[in-house]
């Protein structure tokens, strides 16, 4: 049991913003509460950007509070404009409902929805109340509480209004009202007094708190977790490239494991605090001893892969990594190669007599022929663990292991297994 959940989350770097910390702390320490976090079905899987709020909910549940998970069957049809440069592609109702079914299964991996006690989590869908609300009710009973002056002064709205190519549609403009009403509805019908979300949701959360104050004359609270960003400080999202999904069919356990292995040193310890249950004292102690930071990524990768893909997924990822990074490729059996493909190693099917440049571009180890030539010339390319620096190299029969496979590598950590179409 976590004694003081707010202090605990602050210690682990899991809070970006919070409303009225002192009052919220007092409420949390006096009684169990109901809180919620919303996830819009904008894809058929959650991604690693969703892990921080999910694990925050899990920690509140461990502290004895009841989490609700709101899936945006309605808001997902509209699209959140927060920190998006252009309007999202609108999805059909049938598509979003299919995605919701898959996302429910993923959420159940992290949050206890079956304990049958006071802190048991529940999953709800805002389509259940928005689908029965007519436009007059929405405009008269909700819209009257919102000032256009305040709405257009929000950073994201101002940014989109200045964009001559995209601007913002009334559809997306109304998203803030819908998410705000979600909080008011859940407050009234489920007694939820706290909403959590990513820090990009701060404005929407504050609007919901204000709406509850106006409609019911009651206090509610908000808390945001830090956004997970990549090396260039860009938020991970479904429309960004290189998204790391929680679905093993979209991002294999091996690829998932390698993502955490390859993060920058500074982020490794930060994520150990946010995503694992290793004590902060142990993390700091280890950090002080490990000046090279070499082990933090491996500890993080093991914990995260087991959390999302289980022990079996972790074993698969570690086995592939061990074989590839120890240069044991020539010692693998034919069955091992079959298993590597099943385990999710990046692979591609090519015709014989393919050039090295073509293989590099088709395998996405290079983005263009010119970049492929640069990598070859820089001595960054190996074929079956042997360096290859001939720019016009054509694959030979001797490059095919079991006459079927070739391991192409760029640098130390980027691989693709070629399957030859014989």
UniProtKB/Swiss-Prot annotation:
Task: Name the PROSITE patterns for this protein.
Answer: AA_TRNA_LIGASE_I (PS00178), S4 (PS50889)
A matching Pfam family: tRNA-synt_1b
Q: Which Gene3D superfamilies match?
A: HUPs, RNA-binding S4 domain, Tyrosyl-Transfer RNA Synthetase
The protein's annotated catalytic reaction(s) are: tRNA(Tyr) + L-tyrosine + ATP = L-tyrosyl-tRNA(Tyr) + AMP + diphosphate + H(+)
Record: residues binding L-tyrosine: 36, 175, 179
Q: What is the lineage of its organism?
A: Bacteria, Pseudomonadati, Pseudomonadota, Gammaproteobacteria, Enterobacterales
User: Which GO BP annotation is one of this protein's?
Assistant: tyrosyl-tRNA aminoacylation
Protein localization:
Cytoplasm
Functional summary from the UniProt entry: Catalyzes the attachment of tyrosine to tRNA(Tyr) in a two-step reaction: tyrosine is first activated by ATP to form Tyr-AMP and then transferred to the acceptor end of tRNA(Tyr).
Q: Which UniProt keywords apply?
A: Aminoacyl-tRNA synthetase, ATP-binding, Cytoplasm, Ligase, Nucleotide-binding, Protein biosynthesis, RNA-binding
Question: What is stated as this protein's family in its record?
Answer: Belongs to the class-I aminoacyl-tRNA synthetase family. TyrS type 1 subfamily.
PANTHER family referenced in this protein's UniProt entry, alphabetically: TYROSINE--TRNA LIGASE, MITOCHONDRIAL, TYROSYL-TRNA SYNTHETASE
- Give an example GO cellular component term for this record: cytosol
Protein name from the UniProt record: Tyrosine--tRNA ligase
According to the entry, every stretch annotated as the S4 RNA-binding domain falls at 354-411
Motif 'KMSKS' region, residue numbers: 235-239
């Amino acid at each position: 049991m976590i004694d003081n959940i707010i202090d605990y989350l602050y210690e682990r770097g899991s809070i970006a913003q919070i409303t009225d910390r002192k009052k919220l702390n007092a409420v949390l320490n006096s009684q169990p509460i109901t809180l919620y976090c919303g996830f819009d079905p904008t894809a058929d899987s959650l991604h690693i950007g969703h892990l921080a709020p999910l694990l925050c909910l899990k920690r509140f549940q461990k502290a004895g509070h009841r989490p609700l998970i709101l899936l945006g069957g309605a808001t997902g049809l509209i699209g959140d404009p927060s920190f998006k440069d252009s309007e999202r592609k609108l999805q059909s109702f049938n598509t979003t409902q299919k995605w919701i079914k898959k996302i429910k299964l993923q959420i159940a991996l992290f949050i206890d929805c079956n304990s049958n006690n006071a802190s048991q989590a529940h999953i709800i869908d805002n389509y259940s109340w928005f689908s029965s609300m007519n436009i007059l009710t929405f405009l008269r009973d909700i819209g009257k509480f919102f000032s256009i002056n305040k709405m257009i002064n929000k950073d994201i709205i101002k940014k989109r209004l200045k964009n001559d190519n995209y601007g913002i549609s009334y559809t997306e403009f109304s998203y803030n009202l819908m998410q705000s009403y979600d909080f008011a509805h859940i407050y009234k019908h489920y007694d939820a007094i706290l909403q959590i979300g990513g820090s990009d949701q701060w404005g929407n959360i504050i609007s919901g708190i204000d709406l509850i104050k106006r409609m019911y004359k009651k206090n509610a609270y908000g808390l945001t977790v830090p956004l997970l960003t990549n090396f260039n400080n860009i938020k991970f999202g479904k429309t960004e490239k290189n998204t790391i999904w929680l679905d093993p069919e979209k991002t294999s356990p091996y690829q998932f494991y390698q993502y955490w292995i390859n993060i920058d040193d500074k982020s490794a310890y930060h994520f150990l605090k946010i995503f694992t249950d290793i004590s902060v004292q142990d993390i700091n102690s280890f950090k002080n001893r490990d000046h090279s930071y070499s082990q933090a990524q491996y500890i993080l990768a093991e914990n995260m892969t087991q959390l999302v893909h289980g022990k079996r997924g972790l074993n698969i990822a570690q086995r592939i990594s061990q074989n590839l990074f120890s240069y044991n490729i020539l010692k693998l059996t034919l069955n091992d190669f079959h298993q590597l493909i099943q385990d999710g190693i990046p692979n591609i099917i090519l015709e014989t007599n393919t050039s090295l440049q073509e293989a590099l571009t088709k395998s996405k180890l290079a983005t263009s022929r010119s970049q492929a030539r640069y990598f070859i010339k820089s001595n960054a390319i190996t074929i079956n663990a042997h360096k290859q620096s001939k720019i016009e190299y054509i694959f030979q029969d001797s490059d095919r292991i079991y006459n079927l496979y070739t391991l192409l590598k760029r640098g130390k950590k980027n691989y693709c297994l070629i399957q030859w179409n014989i």
